[in-house]
Structure formats: C-alpha cells, structure tokens
Amino acid sequence: MKNNWKRNTRYMGVFAVLAAVFCMIVVLNINTGNVQISVPEILRILFLKKGTQVQMNIIWKIRLPRVLIAAILGGALALSGFLLQTFFSNPIAGPYVLGISSGAKMMVALAMIIFLKYYTSVSSYVLIVAAFTGSMLSIGFILLLARKIRNMATLLVGGIMIGYICSAVTDFVVTFAEDSDIVNLHGWSQGSFSGMSWSNVKVAALMVGITLILTFFLSKPIGAYQLGEMYAQSMGVNIRVFRVLLILLSSVFSACVTAFAGPVSFVGIAVPYLIKHLLGTAKPLVVIPATFLGGAVFCMGCDLIARMAFAPLELNISTVTSIFGAPIVIFMMIKNTLKNKIRIALVFQFLIAKCRMHADIFQFLNYHGITFLPVDIASQFQLSYVVKHSCNCKIVTLLMRKSKLLT
C-alpha cells in the first residue's frame, strides 16, 4: 500500500508539473512576438472577446492556432515514437530515424506539386492521405528488411538509408517543380508550425484525437507485449493483428505531423525516453497520456525558441528540436551500451560460476524470464546462442567455449 501511494504520488506530481509547464508555455507563446500583449489583455480577449481589432486578429488568427497545432502535433509525434519503440523493442526507433517521416514528406511533396497545377490550394485531408501513404511505404520496406535482418542496429541503419532515398526523390521532384510550388515546398519541407489556420487545427485535432483514443484501447495489449511476445500470446493477444495496429496508428500520427508541419526530428525518440524516466514506469495507461502531454510541451517550447531566439528571423522547428533532442538520444545510447555490458558480464559470471550442465542454463534463464535460443553450433567446442531478456527486449549474443563453460 505504501509503495502504491508513493508511486501514485509520483505520477500525479509528474502530470501536475507537465500541466503547469504546458499552461505557462501556452501563455508565453500567445504573449510574445513583435507585438507584446499582456496576460490580462490575453485573458480578456480569450474569455470576454474584448480588445483592439489588431490584438484580436493576432491572437485568434495567428498565435492561438499556431500554439494549438504545435501541442496537437507534438503529442502525436511523441506517441508515434512510443508505438514504434514498442513495435521494434528498441528505444532508438522513431519516425524520423526509421525514414517514415521522409517517406511521408516525399508523398506530400508529390501531392502538392500535382494538385497545385490544377487547384489554388491543397486540402488538408489530401495531405494527410498522401503522408500516410508515404509512411506506409517506408514502413513496408523496413518490415521487408526486418524479415532478412535480425540485428536491430543494422535495421536502424537500413531505415536511415530509406530516409535518404526518400529525401533524394523529394529533391529530384522539387527540381522540376514550378517556382511558385518550390516556394511552398521549401517552407514546408524545413519544418514549421507557422501559417496554421483554424481549419488545420480542426482537422489535426480530429485525426489525432481519434488515433489517441484507439491507442488508449491498446494500452493493455501494449503492456503485455512489453513483457514479451510469449507472455502477450498467453494473455490472449493476437500478435499479428496487434503489430499491424501498432504500425497503422504510428503511421497516422506521423502522417498528421508531416502533412501540416513537415518533418520534425528527434521528438519521437527523446520525449518517450524522458517521460518513462520521470514516471519510473513503462505502464501504457500512465505513459501514453504523459507522452502526449510531454510531446506537446516539448514542441511548443521549441517553437517558442524558434520564433524568439533570433527575432525577427525564425528558425526551423527541426533545428531547435535537434539541438535539444539529439543530446538526449546520445546519452540514451551510451547508457544502454553500459547496461548491455553489465548484463553480459552478469550472464557470463553466472555461466562460469554456476553452470555444470547444459540443462542448467536453460532452466535458470527461463526461470528468470530469459529466453535462451540455440542459433548455430559452429563446431564441437563452440556454441552460439542468442539471449533475449523478455522484460526489456535487449538482445546479446554469447559465444561460449564448451570446454570452459560447460564442463
């Protein structure tokens, strides 16, 4: 009971801090700019709709739609990363790293060039469908690679290469576009929350809201899947259908972001990692809303910095998210490497100290939730095994000398 009380208090504390920071950043985003508007004036304009026409236009037509779209898309991007990390069982997986954002960017660029030849503007729904199609194409190639490549690091490199290919195709298409189309594409392809209208906010809120609700419905299967496929199957989870749903939901989140704001980097990796460490848990029912709120706070804060750091010049949103997100990813990779080394050392120590028979290894590791699968017997004196820890899905390969370890 005491531990539960402490845990719940920690959860409520994290949510309270995130909510307070969220409100503070919303006010700062509306308050700051070339025209300063005080907090009392903001409250009067928002709730009483009283103020000068200039102030009303600045808040209702420019700043408020921008901050809302940043919050919605930031939360969507963070959850897209969380779902991909669950799918691949790797904290480095994200829509930008795996080339999913680049695939969406490629298809949106094609859609914009084609539709702008015949129409003056492109519907938000058309952009979302195009981005979703591009996301699914990239995911399809990654899944094909996953059937051939078991090493996660190599798979991530493959995702990066797919991203480069999609970016190259996008650049090739833009080269042959008309000058007016190039201007629109250039601003969008750099990543920005500027120029958003209320129609954009409504469409994004509708798409992201529906996908968020569906993600909540998957919270229990996600929790079971985090403990390993075998455990999830024993709990009645249809693994094949579940994995398809993870990919679809992640692609919808990523497509919404790319369709409206262009490619935004590192949010899908950095935010879920930070949220899990702040909460001290990976329970989906707690992590999903916290990740969405954390992504909203992160993107709104980065957008504020992008607008005000070198005003009146405005930075690309991806520039700012990379500055703050990349160091977090580097730290995460170093920390995971150290954990893997410690884990390997502990397994080796046990094998050397305790194992006297082949069966002992299987019994001990299976008892402690570790799946021990023979991969290849290279020779009479050497065995190759893959040890997969079901709780954190870290994979290591142990090459053991039969004469030394299995005496």
Task: Give the predicted meaning of each segment.
Residues 1-344, 353-356:
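Alpha-helical transmembrane segments in inner-membrane proteins
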Residues 343-345, 353, 362, 371, ...:
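Residues marking helix boundaries in flexible regions
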Residues 349-350, 363, 385-387, 395:
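Ser/Thr/Pro/Gly-rich low-complexity, intrinsically disordered segments
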Residues 355, 391-393:
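Cysteine-centered motifs
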Residues 359-361, 369, 386:
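Short hydrophobic alpha-helical segments enriched in small aliphatic residues
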Residues 397-406:
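Short, intrinsically disordered C-terminal tails of secreted or membrane-associated proteins
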